[in-house]
Amino acid sequence: VFMESRLRRRDFSNKPSKKGMVMHTTEGLVSKPCAGSVETVWNRLLETLKTLNVPLCATVDHAANARAAGLFMPETRVAFFGKPAVGTHLMLERPEVALELPLRIVISEVPGEGTMLFMPDILWLAHRYGIDPQLDSLRKTLGFMALVSDKVCGD
C-alpha cells in the first residue's frame, strides 16, 4: 500500500515496451526510473546505505563479470544489505524468508528506458511467505525500502 503509492510497478506480461521489445518479468518486482547514469545512481545507493548505517553484505557487478568472460551486457549491479535486528524478526516469523535476505537492490541500464532500480516488493514477499503485513519488522522494511529508493532515484 505505502510502497504501491510511491513506486511504479512494472507489468510487462509479455507486452511490448515503448521501443517494441517484448519484456518479461514475474510478480514481486518493484521498479523505479532513476536520474543519472548507473555509476551515479550506484554511488548514491552506497552512500545512502552508509548514511543510514545499514551494513552492505556484498555487491555484484554483472556487466564487469560479463566483460571478463568476453561478453557484453548493459551496466547492471546488485547490492545486498540489511540489518540483522530487523531481518531476524522476519526469519523467526517464517524461517524460509531467509531465501530473500539479505535485501537487495539492482541498478541497471535498461535499453530504451534508462537507469532503473529494481527491488523486491515487500508486501508480495509477505503474502508469499504468509507473514502478517502489520508485523512491525515488515512495516519497517517496507518503509525503509521506499525511503532508500526515493533517495537513490532522486525523488
Stretch-by-stretch model annotation:
Residues V22-N53:
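Terminal, regulation- and interaction-focused segments at domain boundaries
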Residues N43-R44, D61, E93, F144:
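Short Gly/charged-rich anion-binding patches and loops
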Residues R104-I131:
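Beta-strand/loop substructures that line and gate deep hydrophobic ligand-binding cavities in soluble
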Residues R128-D155:
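Well-ordered alpha/beta subsegment
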Residues V1-F2, R8-V22:
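Short, Lys/Arg-enriched N-terminal segments with co-localized hydrophobic residues
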Residues A58-V106:
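Compact, glycine-rich, soluble single-domain proteins
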